[in-house]
Amino acid sequence: MAEDDPYLGRPEQMFHLDPSLTHTIFNPEVFQPQMALPTDGPYLQILEQPKQRGFRFRYVCEGPSHGGLPGASSEKNKKSYPQVKICNYVGPAKVIVQLVTNGKNIHLHAHSLVGKHCEDGICTVTAGPKDMVVGFANLGILHVTKKKVFETLEARMTEACIRGYNPGLLVHPDLAYLQAEGGGDRQLGDREKELIRQAALQQTKEMDLSVVRLMFTAFLPDSTGSFTRRLEPVVSDAIYDSKAPNASNLKIVRMDRTAGCVTGGEEIYLLCDKVQKDDIQIRFYEEEENGGVWEGFGDFSPTDVHRQFAIVFKTPKYKDINITKPASVFVQLRRKSDLETSEPKPFLYYPEIKDKEEVQRKRQKLMPNFSDSFGGGSGAGAGGGGMFGSGGGGGGTGSTGPGYSFPHYGFPTYGGITFHPGTTKSNAGMKHGTMDTESKKDPEGCDKSDDKNTVNLFGKVIETTEQDQEPSEATVGNGEVTLTYATGTKEESAGVQDNLFLEKAMQLAKRHANALFDYAVTGDVKMLLAVQRHLTAVQDENGDSVLHLAIIHLHSQLVRDLLEVTSGLISDDIINMRNDLYQTPLHLAVITKQEDVVEDLLRAGADLSLLDRLGNSVLHLAAKEGHDKVLSILLKHKKAALLLDHPNGDGLNAIHLAMMSNSLPCLLLLVAAGADVNAQEQKSGRTALHLAVEHDNISLAGCLLLEGDAHVDSTTYDGTTPLHIAAGRGSTRLAALLKAAGADPLVENFEPLYDLDDSWENAGEDEGVVPGTTPLDMATSWQVFDILNGKPYEPEFTSDDLLAQGDMKQLAEDVKLQLYKLLEIPDPDKNWATLAQKLGLGILNNAFRLSPAPSKTLMDNYEVSGGTVRELVEALRQMGYTEAIEVIQAASSPVKTTSQAHSLPLSPASTRQQIDELRDSDSVCDSGVETSFRKLSFTESLTSGASLLTLNKMPHDYGQEGPLEGKI
């Protein structure tokens, strides 16, 4: 610390002293406290530095200090204290200790030294005549109150001048002649008193009360015995008040997460020892193999620091977001003022999970082959394809599709199904056929079985013996199969169950055969699906039904067919079935952006109110991903209104997610649908306007204020308004916007402006009443401070410069008239309202509609705001309006031949490049409000008729009166 002090190393910067006096006043080399000094004469050296941190400065009302200022090497069981030594000298001496500042230039400090040998804030100790080491075991530091700094400092300077204690160094260079002690009751003249007063006034403004240094000065006796021979003073390392927020040791106490995604932006709660909210950073760093260091900083504002002990921040993006394995880094607190850091803690960046909904994973599963439908395996009997995908002969085992399971039944092979007759003692068979049953002709038919069982209509097995019951016959009707079983013993009941399966299998085989015939005739795949519609409720290993999988694989026509064949009794169960991630088919349709499938599912009765595993409804998912087309379809449903203000598992409404995704179209849809723009998210009470300010998105903030009538002074749970956040983050544009919308810069939040424990100077003056923090208190720059005090916002460029960029005047009036007519057509894709959105003036559409000629008003406003023909052509190109483009090209072709400077490059790349020059790289200029910051204030766009720029708003319940002026 001391060796880096600019004062100790650059004497020419101290008070601009006369070079002839520099050597006599002091030599900077003697200020190296731990270094042997290159001189043959006496000099002063620091043997033990004071401990820099952990010692508390005490106020008068707190009483004396408990223990003296410890030394740097002091330990619990081995105390040490600051020590100095007078080298190259043996004899009597006097050493004085003064408190000085820690700034670039050393001055007297207003705090006082107290303890043994201390008087008037100065410690005086005698040394020698043999032991020239002087220790200071009982030094305390008395903290002066802010109100008494000037008074104390002036008295301290006067005393230093009277006694000759370094007045030229510590007070003013013009007082350097008052050096030697022995002046006694030296009287100071008016000029000297005025110099002292001016120095005290100046230093009072600059003094840091949380840090001091010790300045040791030794005096040796002269020939008369008076201590007038001054040795060069030495200055200790800085001593920080342990009660000062910017002086305490930085320490991370707890974090709720120690890992995050490489993309950053994940919220972490960090508990720490006391910090100063405007003087702290959260630093992530990694030491690279080549010796370099990567670092990133957590994103938070002063409003995210709670009572100096907790910080809520968002993680920074890692240097490489394409890593395939986790990367270990460190996180630490760092103070801005002195770059002091805490002990680092490990943090893990893991690769980005791009498929959180597992849609891509399921799409990448092995697709079934056509040959798989014929079954496989081996067996002793005849093979063949089967309805259940099994094959082989008798005794062979079949293969079902992956993820599905069907029971293996032991029956003889029939129609491709493997049956095994040896599972029971009976060799019961089955009769089938038409009215002329073949079983009567077959001597080996099933009616010749010895043991018989009868199955009644209720599925119960009735046991009889051959003596009790006559052999039964199998009767077969047209299209029916009736089984009659011979009775047997109780042990043969398993065979009856096998026979039941055989009966059902035969019925199923006939149904599938008929469906196949119908499909061959009609070519309609629904004929095949209809006989299997009950199987649509089957789920695979991920819980997905066939409807889920059809949506995942983007088979929209198959989804329609499935919805049609399952309509009826079981449709509700299937259409709202959830997989293992609690996703319904409607959730997946929204995630995969299939607008037509969303419409089909809603028509079929899909339930909008069902939530996924994270509590997200389909409105949340659409807003989160910025799918405005899907969101528009969902909002038309009658149940959508009930979900507009429903929070998800993170306490966020759909409008909050639209803000976080920076989607202006989604925000406009939600506002138009009636979403509550003042709704608070449930974690900290932020509204959509708070989130817009946090994301520094002036377009969304302007939309909320102008279109949504958002409450400009809405508060979070701790009383923070959007203006608090804008001021704390230093955003001049948003501060100007909010101030123009009527935000109050004097609103206090619940965060105390200062800590009572650190403000003993207020004792006795309304003790316990601490004001909150206002946006003015949080202003991080003078520009923001001036805006909050009513000074007009001044952009970095001038209006004249922007006017020079506009070239709309080159279009003749007849050309403009043709454009007006083309833009007045009712086609919503080609009218003036769509063009306004493309030109970044969509926020003013409601105002344009008030004009008798909206298209003319739009073009006039665009021209006055510095618009260019290039931007206009590009906007029309995006609309696909070739007729309007041809009108402009035809009018501009003569100009092109005469002046290359006014040519119209119609290349999209070049046009976009010109547009981007007027836009910030980190935001989208499409709300109109943002355009007003980059171009001329649009108050000049209309000079007659209804004003388009003073947007009259509905009366507010929260006290905002009058119109919201467009000029900021």
Swiss-Prot record:
ANK repeat coordinates: 542-571, 581-610, 614-643, 650-679, 684-714, 718-747, 771-801
Region (Disordered): 425-453
Expression triggers: By phorbol ester and TNF.
GO process annotations (BP): antibacterial innate immune response; apoptotic process; B cell receptor signaling pathway; canonical NF-kappaB signal transduction; cellular response to angiotensin; cellular response to dsRNA; cellular response to interleukin-17; cellular response to interleukin-6
Keyword Nucleus: yes
Effect of S907A: Prevents p105 proteolysis in response to TNF-alpha
Annotated effect of mutating S932A: Decrease in stimuli-induced phosphorylation. Loss of phosphorylation
UniProt effect for mutating N678A: Fails to promote HIF1AN-dependent 2-oxoglutarate decarboxylation
Modification after translation: Generation of the NF-kappa-B p50 (Nuclear factor NF-kappa-B p50 subunit) transcription factor takes place both cotranslationally and post-translationally via non-mutually exclusive mechanisms. A cotranslational processing allows the production of both p50 and p105 (Nuclear factor NF-kappa-B p105 subunit) from a single NFKB1 mRNA. While translation occurs, the particular unfolded structure after the GRR repeat region acts as a substrate for the proteasome, promoting degradation of the C-terminus.
Pfam families referenced in this protein's UniProt entry, alphabetically: Ank, Ank_2, Death, RHD_dimer, RHD_DNA_bind
Keywords linked to the UniProt accession: Acetylation, Activator, ANK repeat, Apoptosis, Cytoplasm, DNA-binding, Hydroxylation, Isopeptide bond, Lipoprotein, Nucleus, Phosphoprotein, Repeat, S-nitrosylation, Transcription, Transcription regulation, Ubl conjugation
Mutagenesis / variant outcome for changing S923A: Decrease in stimuli-induced phosphorylation. Loss of phosphorylation
PROSITE patterns, per the entry: ANK_REP_REGION, ANK_REPEAT, REL_1, REL_2
GO molecular function terms noted in the UniProt entry: actinin binding; chromatin binding; DNA-binding transcription activator activity, RNA polymerase II-specific; DNA-binding transcription factor activity; DNA-binding transcription factor activity, RNA polymerase II-specific; DNA-binding transcription repressor activity, RNA polymerase II-specific; identical protein binding; protein sequestering activity
Ranges where the RHD domain occurs: 42-367
Main function: NF-kappa-B is a pleiotropic transcription factor present in almost all cell types and is the endpoint of a series of signal transduction events that are initiated by a vast array of stimuli related to many biological processes such as inflammation, immunity, differentiation, cell growth, tumorigenesis and apoptosis. NF-kappa-B is a homo- or heterodimeric complex formed by the Rel-like domain-containing proteins RELA/p65, RELB, NFKB1/p105, NFKB1/p50, REL and NFKB2/p52 and the heterodimeric p65-p50 complex appears to be most abundant one.
Designated name of the protein: Nuclear factor NF-kappa-B p105 subunit
Gene this protein is translated from: NFKB1
